Amino acid sequence: MKLLALDIGGVCLRLTPERVFQSMNLDPDNLPDGYEKAYLDYSIGKIGSWQFAKDLQAIVGQSMTVAQIHDAWMKFLDTEDLKTTRLLEALWDRGWHIVFFSDTQPWHIEGLRDILSYSKRIPDAIYSCDVGAEKPSDAMFTAFEERYGRPDLYLDDRLCNIEGGLRHGWNAVQFTETTAEQLLAELKA
């Protein structure tokens, strides 16, 4: 059985941070002090969802409730990439085991399960919030290999993460607009 390490944001679904910033009245070019730290701390599991919401309440300086912050944060996740969906279906038809390999947080893990039509077919995952580090950290790649072994293919949209995979000897491919179609064509050949 072949193994795919699959990033989520920018590969399985579109990310729309601009909608989050708009909902919180934040300027993405001039984020308030503490925003990036709170984001990273949440992404690596240093703080939980409640603390993240409280931190954002203080950072935003507005009277947003935890529920409003949650709703705004969920706007980060947009729509499923149907080209990726078709690629995954073809891989499953050929017996591939697919594992999510993503920098993400509990709220987004919960949300992507509602957005991705195939999410229940991918119960296995390595998430940054569980590992305590983000890609391209060695800790993420090591955690994946210790649990699942070295993947036959790794797809990610971020070049720095692809470079991290290559450093670990992975067959890493940067995901672009045409990657899913190219891989589908190769599978049919």
How should each PLM-predicted stretch be described?
Residues 1-40, 44, 58-63, 167-168:
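Active-site neighborhood of HAD-like aspartate-dependent phosphohydrolases
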Residues 2-6, 105-106, 110-189:
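Asp-based, Mg2+/Mn2+-dependent phosphohydrolase catalytic module
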Residues 21, 35, 52-57, 73, ...:
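Hydrophobic alpha-helical core bundles mediating ligand binding, dimerization, or RNAP-core interactions
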Residues 33-35, 55-56, 60-70, 122-125:
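Short, basic/glycine-rich phosphate-binding loops at helix/coil junctions
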Residues 41-49, 114:
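A short secondary-structure junction motif
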Residues 66-113:
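Substrate-recognition element of Asp-dependent hydrolases with the DxDx(T/V) motif
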